Amino acid sequence: MRTRTTLIRAAAAEFDRDGYDGTSLAQISKVAQISIGAVTFHFPSKAELADAVLAEGNAVTLAAMEKVLSASLPALCTVVDLSLELARLMEQETVVRSAIRLSRERHGCTSWSDLWLPTVRRLLDQAHEDGQLRDDALPADVTTLVEHLLGGAETYLRCRMCTEVAYEGAVGQLKRLWHLALVGVSATDRAGAPTFPGLRAPD
């Protein structure tokens, strides 16, 4: 079991950095300091090892989701907290970043976002029913916003983590973006506030 865990961790780091096609069992064997024979004993193919990494990353994600949901906060607050927790996982958990990349690069894999998007949509439907959202803030649109925020967080992390330049954490950045989304950026209550005809909903 210890060898299997070591291999999954080593594979996660390699898949996260180089992707599925750019990673070999020999490469993982070298990083894990485990013979190729032992590697293939536990995982006869790279695909099976990738499946194990994907399953582990998804399990970590689902466990984190369950923890957030167990707090039983108002629906909109739960959506915000859930998105921040998912951003934290992307930043701190290599196996989760690896699972995200593998789900995108391998044919036939379920997208990582499919683990949490239905929950986000359900919570936003509830938030709308409870009056926590403006009438024109449709749950479907806010769900898309959450998806874009987290997609942007992953892109931001991937661009920054491969450099030596200091960068802001994704969670702190996402908190500020949520503040903008919830409070708004337009001074609509001030004289001379701009209008945005291009953003008007179609009749």
Where are these regions (language model features)?
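Basic, helix-initiating cap at the start of DNA-binding domains
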Residues: M1-D18, L25-V31, A47-A52, V60
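Amphipathic alpha-helical interaction segments
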Residues: T6, C77-E85, D141-H148, G172, ...
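Short, charged helix-capping/linker segments at alpha-helix termini
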Residues: D21-G22, L133
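Short hydrophobic/aromatic patch on the recognition helix
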Residues: A32-F43
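Hydrophobic alpha-helical connector segments
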Residues: A52, A63-Q92, V96, E105-G108, ...
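Amphipathic alpha-helical packing segments from all-alpha helical-bundle domains
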Residues: A59-L62, E105-Q132, A137-H148, G172
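Short linear capping/connector segments at secondary-structure termini
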Residues: S98-R106, F196-L199
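C-terminal peripheral helix-coil segments that are non-catalytic and often amphipathic
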Residues: D114, P118-D130, C159-D203
